[in-house]
Amino acid sequence: MKNAIDIKGVSKTYRDFTLDSLTLSLPEGSIMGLIGENGAGKSTTIKLIMNAILPDSGSIEVLGMDNKSPGFAEAKEDIGVVLDEAYFPVSLNCKNVNKIMGLTYKKWDPDKYFGYIKKFGLPEKKAFKDFSRGMKMKL
């Protein structure tokens, strides 16, 4: 069976934290959740997989592709990540987020996005900083 994610010996060091020699595989068709204490490295691992930060060592393949390869940016269009909270600048609102996502994802569908905004009862013009934690998770 092929793996959707292969992480081999990945390390990342910050001033006060080290993710050391992480190795894991996720078979295709599987769903994975990362659970752990605050500061355990869950968000760092996701950022490494999505190539939002670079590892100090090791390798990461996603869908059979090195996540640092030029084609990975296009492959990210088909990858879903759900974080515990959205990390948008505090002054943005739902309409601003739509514009950013439209520029980020080729397949972005504003009608579907605003359908979910309505379904989840999120105010389109309210600043992100004024959202509750639950509202941020929905966004």
PLM region spans:
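Conserved A-loop
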Residues: 11-14, 62, 69, 105
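Walker A (P-loop) phosphate-binding loop of ABC-type ATPase nucleotide-binding domains
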Residues: 37-41
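ABC-family P-loop ATPase nucleotide-binding domains
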Residues: 77, 83-139
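Conserved ABC transporter NBD signature motif
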Residues: 58-68, 74-75
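Conserved beta-strand
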Residues: 7-10, 17-27, 58
